[in-house]
């Protein structure tokens, strides 16, 4: 009996240890979901959209961007150019050490951020227009989930962004605020706008022209051994996920360079060092070169897909996942295939032929 009691005490102690571990980070889930993120206002002028077209032209077969910047008009915002707008304008000291936005971060020790994928729903009735008018992004954290063994936990954060034009009365209310307006006065107007656009039901589009879900994974601090391009030859080879279909719709290879990555970072107002600083990539993150942006992969897949759609067919919903890194100065091959009526599969392959990004698309006919 003495031995049995000893075993029971050990099991109980183990359970207490497990509960203590679970409670060490479990507070992040409700805390992050309760965060009130400030609305992000932007003017939907054609400039950023035009600059992206010009930046991608050398990488897209037969692309012909306009020779001049067009004035604002009722032209719909191209898919997926919403990525170029609605980024917060923070002073540099307010950014995290790696250059990222602190609003989504769990905090220490989860300082390493990776874009895991996302989804986008486009309104069939109220698309955003490049008419120069003021619009807003209402953003919230839908979920924050802790996964992994003790000491190896990761935080998966799902961020919802609802993009919508402002009403004339809302634009007037903001314009009437003096430069010295109090935080309370500003917050009241922002709360009214948030209340009009946000929905508790994440399937309800409401007045949003674009509903985006961004899935970000935060990893714990680690100091990986510095990595060089040659060092990868001696490293264990990861499992390669091969595509499960032929690219019957399109297949196109590009060689991304640092200029493309810089331009996309600039257009998206993204200071994340993994896209800009090769030394940071090698010594802090353990990557052999600059990382190709997850949203840039998404952009190429959407641009190439839309060039292959039938007349009147428009993208309505996209869901995608980033499975493995893509790198600057290494070829990336974008592929697409039909998957039934109004359905398509898109993916990106690395130099090893493995799938690094994959997505599914549903279209509608207008």
Where are these regions (language model features)?
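HotDog/MaoC-like acyl-thioester-processing domains
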Residues: 23-38, 116-256, 322-366
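Hydrophobic, proline/glycine-rich low-complexity stretches
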Residues: 4, 12-136, 315
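Acidic/His-leaning functional-site neighborhoods
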Residues: 252-333, 337-345
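Catalytic strand-loop segment that frames the active site of acyl-thioester-processing enzymes
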Residues: 23-86, 207-292
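Hydrophobic/aromatic-lined pockets within catalytic cores
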Residues: 57-60, 146, 306-310
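Short, hydrophobic/amphipathic alpha-helical packing segments
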Residues: 49, 137-141, 298
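Terminal targeting signals and extreme-terminal segments of soluble enzymes
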Residues: 99-105, 129, 295, 300, ...
């Amino acid at each position: 009996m003495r031995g049995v009691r000893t075993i029971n005490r050990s099991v109980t102690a183990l359970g207490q240890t497990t509960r203590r571990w679970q409670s060490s980070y479990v507070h992040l889930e409700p805390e992050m979901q309760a965060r009130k993120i400030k609305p992000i206002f932007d003017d939907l002028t054609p400039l950023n959209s035009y600059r992206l077209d010009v930046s991608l032209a050398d990488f897209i077969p037969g692309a012909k961007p306009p020779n001049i910047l067009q004035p604002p008009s009722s032209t719909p915002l191209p898919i997926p150019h919403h990525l170029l707008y609605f980024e917060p304008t923070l002073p540099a000291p307010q950014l995290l050490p790696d250059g990222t936005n602190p609003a989504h971060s769990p905090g220490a020790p989860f300082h390493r951020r990776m874009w895991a994928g996302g989804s986008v729903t486009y309104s069939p009735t109220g698309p955003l227009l490049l008419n120069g008018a003021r619009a807003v992004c209402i953003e919230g954290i839908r979920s924050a989930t802790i996964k992994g063994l003790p000491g190896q936990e990761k935080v998966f954060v799902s961020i919802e962004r609802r993009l919508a034009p402002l009403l004339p009365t809302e634009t007037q209310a903001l314009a009437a605020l003096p430069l010295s307006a109090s935080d309370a006065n500003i917050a009241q107007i922002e709360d009214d706008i948030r209340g009009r656009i946000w929905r508790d039901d994440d399937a309800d589009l409401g007045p949003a022209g674009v509903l985006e879900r961004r899935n970000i994974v935060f990893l714990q601090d680690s100091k990986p051994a510095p990595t060089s391009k040659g060092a990868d030859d001696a490293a264990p080879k990861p499992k390669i996920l091969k595509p499960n279909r032929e690219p019957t719709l399109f297949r196109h290879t590009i060689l991304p360079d640092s200029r493309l990555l810089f331009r996309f970072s600039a257009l998206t107002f993204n200071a994340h060092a993994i896209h800009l600083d090769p030394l940071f990539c090698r010594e802090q993150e353990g990557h052999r070169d600059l990382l190709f942006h997850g949203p840039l992969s998404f952009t190429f897949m959407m641009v190439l897909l839309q060039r292959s759609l039938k007349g009147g067919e428009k993208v309505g919903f996209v869901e995608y996942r980033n499975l493995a890194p893509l790198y600057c100065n290494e070829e990336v091959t974008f592929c697409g295939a039909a998957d039934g009526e109004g359905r398509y599969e898109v993916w990106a392959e690395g130099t090893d032929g493995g799938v690094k990004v994959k997505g599914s698309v549903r279209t509608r006919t207008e």
